[in-house]
Amino acid sequence: MPLVTSKEMFEKAYNGGYAIGAFNVNNMEIIQGITEAAAELKAPLILQVSKGARAYANRTYLKKLVEAAVIETGLPIVLHLDHGDSFELCKSCIEDGFTSVMIDASSKPFAENIALTRQVVEYARDHGVVVEAELGTLAGIEDEVNVSAEDSSYTRPEEVEEFVSKTGCDSLAIAIGTSHGAYKFKPGTKPQLRFDVLEEVSRRLPGFPIVLHGSSSVPQDLVAKVNQYGGNMPGAIGVPEDQLRKAASLSVCKINIDSDLRLAMTASIREHFALHPADFDPRQYLKPARQAIKELVTHKIVDVLGCDGKAF
């Protein structure tokens, strides 16, 4: 099976009340852990690559690793550009064989966001590629994305119809209170997503797939393990999983997860070196790290996304 677009995936997810996991990848072990979990659960999958990951892992290596995952698992897999910040980057990824790209012009004025998104959509259409766009701006730091809380903003539902109509985008990322990175909410506050915004967007765009970025839950057992074995992550808090599950049961068809993968891998490696300080063969610590990724993704697919058994 070749790489696929997310169009059919999202139609099924919207009608079925579940979401597809979009997991950020940047090396072999992360890709293997994610795809092994998805294969066992027969779950559809989006593997997404940021600008930073593409630079780190080399565009050719990363593409071939994803292609190997398709061959090995036989799963429907989307290769997606996460947070493309220019037409040129989106064009390059499309030419490299990506089946989905995101153009993130959410920090620009509304009219400029529309114009740049439309430019990407027109090019992508000619190549059979789908486009995700964004309205509203998430706070937080992750890879190339760095937005202060002061510069973040919720999506304005009254803008979504005009935006989708004028751009022709295939899915829309909205801001309802999630944020990038591992420090999403202040300690002592109750994390709460703006479901009123989501519901109003859904009312205005019936049947249209919505995307949530910054949706890692930052499991506290992983944070504790990182800190236990020499880390320093005080106050790391994520999005409650019950709220993500609720979003998946509504119009959210794609939920992005990155920080949780980083936590799982880092916690495993820190623990391994604390318990086995003499080890120096990378396979000795990367194998359990890969297993930690697999276990995390298994949990996400079954208990948060609800997309197990939905691959075919």
Language-model regions, residue ranges each:
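Basic/polar N-terminal segments that are highly enriched at the extreme N-terminus
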Residues: 1-3, 312
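Generic N-terminal amphipathic, Lys/Arg-enriched alpha-helix
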Residues: 5-21, 279-280
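Long, repeat-rich segments with strong aromatic
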Residues: 212-218
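C-terminal alpha-helical cap/extension of soluble enzyme domains
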Residues: 228-231, 239-312
